[in-house]
């Protein structure tokens, strides 16, 4: 490794014995041996990691070559569909990155093309999508509790109408063991069919 012959090694040992003495020489030899062992293990670790990285890079290059070869061997129909998908993806990206321009006419009758002025709301990019989402949730929760309270009552009334008897809403509620709540009428109760007597 260091091109040290037997004579040179013997000379180093004699000098070490003279300088360090017989008591400290074995400790110094063990320390130097542990340093050499650590350096060798470090060198082998670095060498192994480099060889693994080179193998991985070669493997990735071979995969890229195979992928390119398989893409070149595709049928024209598949290539056309892939190109269409890429174009659609790019168009969607452009649609979300561009801001809407205020070039619309105020009066759709003047423009002559009514289809150009009507856009579906889902294609308009939102500046604050959470605000729009919160509004939907609030509207749904405002309607749903009233609907859920009215459904058992409506079902019981409908059953009694089908039997030929006319039942009041108190009887219908009593049949379902549901106590009526005293609350303000909601939009759902306004849609309820009225009971004709």
Swiss-Prot record:
Its main location: membrane. GO terms for molecular function: protein transmembrane transporter activity. Residues 104-113, 160-169 have a biased composition (Basic and acidic residues). Part of the twin-arginine translocation (Tat) system that transports large folded proteins containing a characteristic twin-arginine motif in their signal peptide across membranes. Together with TatC, TatB is part of a receptor directly interacting with Tat signal peptides. TatB may form an oligomeric binding site that transiently accommodates folded Tat precursor proteins before their translocation. It comes from the Bacteria. Residues 180-197 have a biased composition (Low complexity). The keyword Secreted does not apply. The chain crosses the membrane at residues 1-21. Residues 93-197 are annotated as: Disordered. The Tat system comprises two distinct complexes: a TatABC complex, containing multiple copies of TatA, TatB and TatC subunits, and a separate TatA complex, containing only TatA subunits. Substrates initially bind to the TatABC complex, which probably triggers association of the separate TatA complex to form the active translocon. It is a single-pass membrane protein. HAMAP family: TatB. GO terms for cellular component: TAT protein transport complex. It is found in: Cell inner membrane. Coiled coil: none annotated. Keywords: Cell inner membrane, Cell membrane, Membrane, Protein transport, Translocation, Transmembrane, Transmembrane helix, Transport. GO terms for biological process: protein transport by the Tat complex. Belongs to the TatB family. This is Sec-independent protein translocase protein TatB. It comes from Pectobacterium atrosepticum (strain SCRI 1043 / ATCC BAA-672) (Erwinia carotovora subsp. atroseptica).
């Amino acid at each position: 490794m260091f091109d040290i012959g037997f004579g040179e090694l013997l000379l180093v040992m004699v000098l070490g014995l003279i300088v360090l003495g017989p008591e400290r020489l074995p400790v110094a030899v063990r320390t130097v041996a542990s340093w050499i062992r650590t350096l060798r293990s470090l060198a082998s670790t670095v060498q192994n990691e480099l060889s693994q990285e080179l193998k991985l890079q070669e493997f990735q290059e071979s995969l890229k070559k195979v992928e390119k070869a398989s893409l070149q061997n595709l049928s024209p129909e598949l290539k056309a569909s892939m190109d269409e998908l890429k174009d659609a993806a790019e168009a969607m990206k452009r649609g979300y990155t561009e801001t809407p321009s205020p070039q619309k006419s105020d009066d759709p009758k003047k423009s002559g093309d009514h289809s150009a002025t009507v856009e579906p709301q889902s294609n308009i990019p939102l500046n604050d999508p959470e605000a729009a989402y919160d509004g939907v949730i609030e509207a749904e929760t405002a309607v749903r509790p009233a609907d859920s309270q009215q459904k058992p009552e409506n079902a019981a009334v409908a059953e009694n109408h089908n039997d030929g008897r006319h039942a009041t809403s108190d009887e219908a509620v009593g049949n379902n063991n549901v106590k009526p709540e005293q609350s303000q009428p909601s939009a759902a109760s306004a849609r309820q069919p009225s009971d004709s007597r």
